[in-house]
Curated annotation (Swiss-Prot):
This is Subtilisin-like serine protease Cur l 4.0101. Glycans are attached at N245, N285, N448. It comes from Cochliobolus lunatus (Filamentous fungus). InterPro entries: PCSK9_ProteinaseK-like, Peptidase_S8/S53_dom, Peptidase_S8/S53_dom_sf, Peptidase_S8_His-AS, Peptidase_S8_Ser-AS, Peptidase_S8_subtilisin-like, Peptidase_S8_subtilisin-rel, S8pro/Inhibitor_I9. Transmembrane segments: none annotated. The record marks N316 as: Important for catalytic activity. Serine protease.
């Protein structure tokens, strides 16, 4: 489905995406389509029924059908140029998928091959492949201050002049944890990663092992950068599923999820065999989204079932996140965006599929173009990596799997529940009643996971009135602090200028 890297700023009005189902014969597998996404012509994702154990015979069969139909078209074209025979070249089988709960494949097939697939007894359903892209992409202004988002997740109450640029954290946060950033890639040579970022996999065929867009690098920096990251010791693996223009296909995204899940499983096995010292687990971030995709949601849920802790962006359409994927994947942590002024960001999706909020407006992080590049952009794409980093941060506070003090794994389900339980309740304004008003919290710098969890949640104090706030600000008159005060006031003003950050769109 059209996948938009959920970053920067969206168009505000969006129709709720829905599925349409095509059935020609009663016994044929249905073909699912999203009415809100731009389809990739003749490209499909095929999902097997639960009884299928060994898919290799089916893969051989579908390739033979594809080859036979291709040969017949070529023969027809040779016989007569007057016949209405397609000149399109169909690529055949593209990816195979094998995750717990999801087994299938994708490919580029003609209509005859598609009909044969639909009538095969192994096939549960077929989903039309569709485009994915970055959500937004406007070039925003850049602030030179430390990210306010890091400060916000480490403080319970609204940020003030004294706390707005102070991030409290455990020094070893992220140590021993791998984070798979499924995006446009990562500028792995950026100095902020200190050599902890590596290239994992490029899924789009023929694309370079580089981030030509910047979005993935920005997300990776928020996850694990030395200066800009939540979990400053975590290791990042770039999983490129979108091209440099920020777009791609659903089938490539699903393959990227599979790569991350299998890489995590391999890391677990290596740790058990003593080949990956100090390993504590894996998280993943996916700041992309679009129309509803049953296949992508199933892939994410399967990856979580395999032990991969997953954060996904809620979306930037100011609409119900349940109508978007992967935001609707129930096993993942679905993240909405908040502002410096403790509001729900005006673009952030909402609804019962949202699990938590994190900073997402005017977020400073790493960028492409040099080893020192930075950029400030906005979106739920920027909120989600705060949570992916926080999941890694929390995992790192546990003993390593090969340690004599190792404890039972914190399952993704348990850590998700704990993350929500310790969040700051009622922190934000403009949150619909059907949406959890919970802002992420990292424990305020504590390195004791048990202590953080036992502290539980927190309900914010009533915010000061505008008059009280103005009076308090007026009394800050210490000359040596005036420059910092100006920075804070400018940041607050910037957070309130909605139109400025969407290229003038209201």
């Amino acid at each position: 489905m059209k996948y938009s890297l959920i970053a920067a700023l969206p168009a505000l009005a969006a129709a709720s995406p829905t599925f349409s189902t095509e059935t020609i014969h009663k016994q044929s597998a249905p073909v699912l389509s999203s009415t809100s996404a731009k389809e990739v012509p003749n490209s499909y994702m095929v999902v097997f029924k639960k009884h299928v154990k060994d898919a290799s015979k089916h893969h051989d069969w579908v390739q033979s059908v594809h080859s036979k139909n291709t040969q017949e078209r070529m023969e027809l074209r040779k016989r007569s140029s007057d016949l209405p025979v397609s000149n399109e070249v169909f690529a055949g089988l593209k990816h195979t998928y094998e995750l717990s709960g999801l087994k299938g494949y994708s490919g580029h097939f003609d209509d005859e091959t598609l009909e044969a697939i639909r009538n095969h007894p192994d096939v549960d359903y077929i989903e039309r492949d569709s485009e994915v892209r970055i959500l937004g992409g406007d070039e925003p202004e850049t602030e030179n201050n430390s990210p306010w988002g890091l400060a916000r997740i480490s403080h319970r109450d609204s940020l003030s002049f004294g706390t707005w640029n102070k991030y409290l954290y455990a020094a070893d946060g992220g140590e021993g944890v791998d984070v798979y950033v499924i995006d446009t890639g990562t500028n792995v040579d950026h100095v902020d990663f200190e050599g902890r970022a590596k290239w994992g996999k490029t899924i789009p065929n023929g694309d370079a092992d580089e981030d030509g867009n910047g979005h993935g690098t920005h997300c990776s920096g928020t996850v694990a950068g030395k200066k800009y990251g939540v979990a400053k010791k975590a290791h990042v693996y770039a999983v490129k599923v979108l091209r440099s223009n920020g777009s791609g296909t659903m089938s490539d995204v699903v393959k990227g999820v599979e790569f991350a899940a299998k890489s995590h499983s391999e890391a677990v096995s290596a740790a058990k065999n003593g080949k990956k010292k100090g390993f504590k687990g894996s998280t993943a971030n996916m700041s992309l989204g679009g129309g509803k995709s049953t296949t992508l949601d199933m892939a994410v849920n399967a990856a979580v079932d395999a032990g991969l802790h997953f954060a996904v962006a809620a979306g930037n359409d100011n609409a119900d996140s349940c109508n978007y994927s992967p935001a609707a994947a129930e096993n993942a942590v679905t993240v909405g965006a908040s502002t410096l002024l403790d509001e729900r960001a005006y673009f952030s999706n909402y609804g019962k599929c949202n699990d938590i909020f994190a900073p997402g407006l005017n977020i400073l992080s790493t960028w492409i173009g040099s080893k020192h590049a930075t950029n400030t952009i906005s979106g739920t794409s920027m909120a989600s990596p705060h949570i992916a980093g926080l999941l890694a941060y929390m995992l790192s506070l546990q003993p390593a799997k090969d340690s004599a003090y190792a404890v039972a794994d914190i399952t993704p389900k348990k850590l998700k529940a704990n993350l929500i339980a310790i969040g700051t309740v009622g922190a934000l304004s403009d949150v619909p009643s059907n949406t959890a008003n919970v802002l992420a919290w990292n424990g305020g710098g504590s390195s004791n996971y048990t202590d953080i969890i036992e502290k539980g949640g927190y309900t914010v104090k009533k915010a000061a009135s505008k008059e009280e706030e103005k009076e308090s600000e007026f009394r800050i008159t210490i000359p040596s602090l005036s420059e910092l005060e100006d920075d804070f006031e400018k940041a607050k003003e910037s957070a309130g200028r909605k139109a400025h950050h969407v290229g003038g769109k209201l």
